Amino acid sequence: MKYCRIFSIALLSLVTSSTLLHGINKVEWDFFTYIQADNNLAPFGVINVKDMQKVGSTSDVNILVQWDKPSDNMTYRYKILQNNMVINSSIKQEMGFFPEKELADSMTWVKNFFPAKRYALILWDHGNGVLDRSKKQPTNSWLSLPGISKKYLRDRGILYDFTQNTFLDNVGLSSACAKIKTTIGQNIDFLGTDACLMAMIEIAYQVKSSVNYLVASQQTEPGLGWPYADVLSSLVGIPTMSTADFSTATVQAYSNFYETGDNADSSYTLSAIDVSKIQAATTTFNAVLKAIAQSQLVDKTTTNAGVKIARANTLAFFINDYIDLIDLYDNLTITFNKISGSRNAKKKGSLRDRMAVAAVAIVTAVAAAKIAAQETIVSSMAGTDYSGKAHGLSIYYPANCLVDASYKKTAFSKQTNWVKVLNSLR
């Protein structure tokens, strides 16, 4: 979900050469961008691939693309070279019929033709976070366009194909990543989403068994998306850098690109998430939910009011149901510290006293959960609109506590008591 900017498009130079397709030995990295551009983002795909050509593949890094373009009924696979690109193969069917299978199959091509020690997979397209699209809504209108009606805020998912009217849902994303892990014989080292609103604890949890690092945005992305030349320059410059360092370098390149100059954007966000630590963040989050549930048994009215105040004061993004998790923890701490301070020592066992004790338990649980959430964030940067408030990891929390049906299908929902607590807050 990228919002469109004024742009100019340069023609791509194109060569075909079987001698440049692949080598025998494993390179350090495959940087593979899966471009689903059969939609209104198509011009930006051209710009981004042109940007990749400024760097080009090296003896240590393969820069690869699978590209679905509008209106030609084909899918193209390229190896990107400096100032040109090589057609590896063309599939006589465009992408979008079976998004999960097509994504998994694309990595079979990468593995067979371009074996590498580490793999970076970038999903390029519209993205709308953890909720899946409601099929009841129109599919030819997008949140990314300025002035779009709020009635279209039901489109969710990632990898939208306008021609086939399909998308990859979150269950499909998890399944595709699991299949890719089997294909390459290891976790995906680096999963990037050049798409909007994907830096969520729920997304990281969906892929926790098959991905090492997730690089994504909490907020909408500018139409130009990632600055690929800058990102790739860091990788080809030091191809042996750790995946954590490459994730950090990607966030820094993105920040540099949108911080100043012609591309300046005060609302940008990008973060790198250590997916191996997402289970601890989820477990401690669930402990917070348990403390809230226990507090509700003491005084549901006061507890619910406190949680709702904290939520109201927390940073929300373009989709108002998506809020910053660490900012939520900070606001829960502030709110329930005030409640705990109302304890009446002279009336031990009174409702106020018991509620104060329950509030202390919430604050204690939140402190541990905040640490765990912070430890998932390798790097996070944001423009001035969100600086100091956007910490790098979002969570789904609808203000009205009405839970979207698609959310209940997510692994995070099934492994925590979040939906139950949300229902209890209504």
Language model: regions and residue ranges:
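N-terminal extension/subdomain marker
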Residues: 24-117
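Structural recognition of the beta-strand scaffold that forms the well-ordered cores
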Residues: 30-34, 62-66, 119-123, 189-193, ...
